[in-house]
Amino acid sequence: MSLASVRRCSPTSQARDFFFPRPEGPYTPLKVHLTFEQQLALLKERGLEIESDTRCKAALQRLGYYRLVGYWYPLRKPRTDGVLGRLDEFQQGASFDAIERLYEFDKQLRLLVLDAIERIEVAVRVDVAYLLGKRHRFAHERPECLDANFTGQSTGKGRTRFTVWSEKLALSVANARDDFVAHHRHKYGGRMPIWVVIEVWDFGLLSKLFSGLQFKDQRKIAQRYGLPDGQYLASWLRALNFSRNVAAHHSRLWNRNVPEVPKIPPKSTHPVLHHLHENPQRLRRIYGVLCLMRHLLRTIAPECDWHERLKMLSGTFPSNELLTLGAAGFPLDWEKAQLWT
C-alpha cells in the first residue's frame, strides 16, 4: 500500500471525538499521523523534487508539514475536471528548494509589513488622540464626540458598535500590565484620558474607532496623508489591520486575498496610485496593501528606506515557471512606478 493510501485510511476507532462532536454526514475520514520520514516519502511519491533528504526532513521538523502546505499548493497540478482546486501530485519542476525559498521570502515580507505598520499605527494614534483630546480628554467615552451612526445604530444584537468597541477597550485595559496603566489606577482611579489610553489600543481598536469618528474628523486626518476624505483612510486601516494580524500570527501572507478591497481615490486626482486601477488583482493581494503603506510612509517617514528594502527583498523571490510575484499582485516592473521611486 502506498503512503498516499495509508494517509487516507480511517482510524480504527470510529467513535466521535468527545471534544469536537460533528453532526451526522458523509465525511471523509481524518488523515492519520505520519512520521517525518513518512512525510518525506509522501512528498517524493507525489513528484516533488527534493535535493537533500536531510535538509527537507529538517525543514519538516522545524516548520511542520501542514504549515508548508500553503506554500507548495501553487506547485501542485491543477484539476482538469472543471472543479476548483488542485491534485495531490506536484507539477513538473516543483522543488522543495523553491518552497523553502518562498517560505523565507514570506517570512521577511511579514517583518517588513510589521515594520511599516508600526510606524503607521503610532502616527495615526497621535492623530486621533490629538484631535479628540482637544475636544475632551475623555472623548473616546462620549457619544457626542463621535459619529451618530457609530454610537446609535444597533449591530442587530441590541448593542451599538460603540458599545462593542468600549467593551473591547475595557478588556484591553483590564489585561494591560504597563507601568502607566498601574500608575493611573493608583493615582487617578484607573480612568485615563485618550492620549494615555490610546497606548493600550491594538490596531483593531484604532481602526474601528477611526471608522466611528465624525466625518469632519476623519477627513481632517485623512487629508494629512493626501487623501480626499476619511472613507479612504478608514478602508486602508481595515486592510492594514488584516495584514498586520496575518503577519503577527506568522501566517502566509504573500499570495493571500484581503477580505475587503481598499478604496483608492480616482487616478485623476491621485496619479501616483493610478496603476492600482489597471488590474483588480493588485488591490486584492498584498501588493495593494504594500502600496497603501508606501503612500502613508511618504508622509510619516519620508526619509525611510522601507521601499528600497522591499525592492531588495523582491529580488529573493524564487521566480520560475510555477511561481511569480504576479500571484501576489505585483505588476511587471512595479519598482519603476512613480510610487516606488
Name every feature range the model reports, one short phrase each:
Residues 3-341:
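Long, contiguous internal "core" modules enriched in hydrophobic/ aromatic residues
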